[in-house]
Amino acid sequence: MKRILTFFIFMLLAMGPGAAGAQTVVMDEGHVAFDYPDSWLVVSPQLCGVYAPLLEDAGLDADELARELEQTRTLSRAYNENYTQYLSVMIGEDELSQEIYEIENATDNQRATLRRRVEANSFWETTGLRTQDAEWQKEDGGYWLYAHYTVTRAGETVGRGLRYITVRNGLYVEMDWRIASGRFSGRDLNAFRARLADLVVTEQIAEPVRDV
């Protein structure tokens, strides 16, 4: 059985995090939905307070986490059992994403510009992220910018992450996987790429007419 979550209706409030089946999270703000592992704890800015006791047991302050998710436009995040890794769905927006609007319409120059921003660490939503490599990949006919990055604090590496970035409805839609220690294996990379099939667009918004 699948659990369908929408962070505007809060269907999750009546259900524990360990219910059977996949956790399908519908995120209206980003016009997307994503299937999280069923055993992971899913939070959003609105749900951090609901799971405050569980988060505090893991050393996470619910209010601080809610602010972080809001500031980074993280629509949802799921933690594994021991909170050593998490998956997130994020959105962003700027002039370039509005110009592209849908990734299929992106020109070579626009894709090159976005890749340069990621490589130069100017795309990231917070400081301390350092791109290790980035490349465009094509999956199911759509372009995704893949990036591998490290998380640094005071010059020390405290985590690593993988991210896929595309453009839908004028928004950057991003799927992120971060681990607190260790390195990603080739098997991890393949598994993460396969997760792209679990991220779907739920609504297509007509592109606004722009003055020439």
List PLM regions with ranges.
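Conserved polar/disulfide-associated segments of primarily extracytoplasmic proteins
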Residues: 46-168, 173-174
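Bacterial N-terminal signal peptides
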Residues: 6-16
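Positively charged n-region of N-terminal signal peptides that target proteins for export
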Residues: 1-4
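Extracytoplasmic/periplasmic, Sec-exported soluble proteins
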Residues: 32, 79-81, 102, 106, ...
